[in-house]
Swiss-Prot record:
The gene is Bop1. Residues 31-43 have a biased composition (Low complexity). This is Ribosome biogenesis protein BOP1. SMART domains: BOP1NT, WD40. The keyword Nucleus applies. The lineage of its organism: Eukaryota, Metazoa, Chordata, Craniata, Vertebrata. Residues 56-66 have a biased composition (Acidic residues).
Amino acid sequence: MAGACGKPHMSPASLPGKRRLEPDQELQIQEPPLLSDPDSSLSDSEESVFSGLEDLGSDSSEEDTEGVAGSSGDEDNHRAEETSEELAQAAPLCSRTEEAGALAQDEYEEDSSDEEDIRNTVGNVPLAWYDEFPHVGYDLDGKRIYKPLRTRDELDQFLDKMDDPDFWRTVQDKMTGRDLRLTDEQVALVHRLQRGQFGDSGFNPYEPAVDFFSGDIMIHPVTNRPADKRSFIPSLVEKEKVSRMVHAIKMGWIKPRRPHDPTPSFYDLWAQEDPNAVLGRHKMHVPAPKLALPGHAESYNPPPEYLPTEEERSAWMQQEPVERKLNFLPQKFPSLRTVPAYSRFIQERFERCLDLYLCPRQRKMRVNVDPEDLIPKLPRPRDLQPFPVCQALVYRGHSDLVRCLSVSPGGQWLASGSDDGTLKLWEVATARCMKTVHVGGVVRSIAWNPNPTICLVAAAMDDAVLLLNPALGDRLLVGSTDQLLEAFTPPEEPALQPARWLEVSEEEHQRGLRLRICHSKPVTQVTWHGRGDYLAVVLSSQEHTQVLLHQVSRRRSQSPFRRSHGQVQCVAFHPSRPFLLVASQRSIRIYHLLRQELTKKLMPNCKWVSSMAVHPAGDNIICGSYDSKLVWFDLDLSTKPYKVLRHHKKALRAVAFHPRYPLFASGSDDGSVIVCHGMVYNDLLQNPLLVPVKVLKGHTLTRDLGVLDVAFHPTQPWVFSSGADGTIRLFS
């Protein structure tokens, strides 16, 4: 670059008395135009390149004597003199240009942070106002400042964290939403602040203090400024203040302070009360309690039942006076004139006076509570829909009472067992009997396999459990079920089991029977595990083998208990955990099958438990009893009942939960089915909401029996009930 301050191109050796330039300085000096060139232009950038060259001419004479002399002759000296004169003429111009450049460069060094180059000119407003907009503010021209597109997911951030060496010092600007890289000075500032140090690294908080005003008395004053004139003349302002205060004292506006009284003062509560007033005397009066009125036992001619016998008289004589219910013995006199004087009259009056004199009296405020306020506010039933409200279908076909029923997992088929020795399969939508299987005995319990990929029904008949393939629905599903049962390979050494697995005959196979599990005692209940491979049965015996577990795939039976805890009424599997719930007459025990230990024991406070059901979530249990109680247990709350419902008038026979809706139902011998809304919240701090919503009636009482079993539809808010009248009813 050429400039007005540049010197002519010459070798370093041609300058007499000057130091030889460094190689990098020689590269910077290129052939600039001569100062004498009138066409050469002056600019700030050109002047700043060679600023300070005027110092070269001001070197000491010692450097001049050290330069090269002799051989160059007068010609070289003449050239050096001309060059020195040109540099001397250009020096003032270069110096002024250098000072102007320095002023222009330092113009904004002392500016405050309020004048920084802020890209977002939205102002001092919360940026949360722009969370739902694609921009973050407006520029000086009124155009929107759009947010940068953030399409990077967590994987991209992780890659940046691994690949980018400056990831740890990159932050996001909240004003513009862009990523900023912290400089070394900013990082060092953050480190100092984290260590509790000052932000300025050059600040020394422990500089030595200079005590200017020391304790030594100096001869001369610190300042020797002459005093003002106003310090020698009276102040007019103070004169006006004094005159105003004197005028206020004369007018009585300013009063002198009262002398302080050192004696303490106390507030008298009864200073304003008149002791002779009627209300004052009777305000704290509490009347004495009245004597109890005499009863029939104190009559001179009491009824015969109030007269004590000889045994009661002797027992009364042996008791302590404090333990006696009556402090006298009732007596009978023929007439009132034959009644003698009461021997304890003076003693009772003396005790009465002692009670009035010594016993303190207390005024009890009676609280008037509206009975309606004590009843909890429950939501209206119409706000809790859907739930079954009316009878939709009646399934007729059984000739005797229907003890049990079960619905298929898909909700299309219904199985029922009766005392007439038949097992019927119904179509739910049309109430049509699709198939009737004669089993030759009373069917006490029936359960459809909950696994939707297996078409299998288990029925308890006398001392056997029958596994039946109903052959309804998908043919591939029916065929796969038969293949699953036929794929069993018996072990080489059969183990001793508490039950016998028998193959059915060809005739029974044609009717749909597949397996028969024989037991030593009659079977009262059968239930499936949620996965459909295990089966639990209850036997009517007092032994430890009254509860058995069967595995269908391996045809293996086992007894989970070593000793009996009473007569078992029913069992159930936990829907999500390896728990087995066993209900006896007075308690419900929860066993952990993997750990083989008792987890919890529930006390329903009922005389005789009849049925039990587990909530689909697994945290709540309901059980019915023969003393017309329905008990709700919250397993997370306590082992005692959360709530006891007494809506039925007779014994409860069955209870059930809906798999999807917050509904549960109970069937009783009074011929009714009561549907209740039971909402279980995910919040553990909120208790379940139990509201009875509908009473369904339709069954007729037969032999003092009503509803024997209830079951919900798996997907619809429908409930099925079987009764002693031989019918099955669907309420929707």
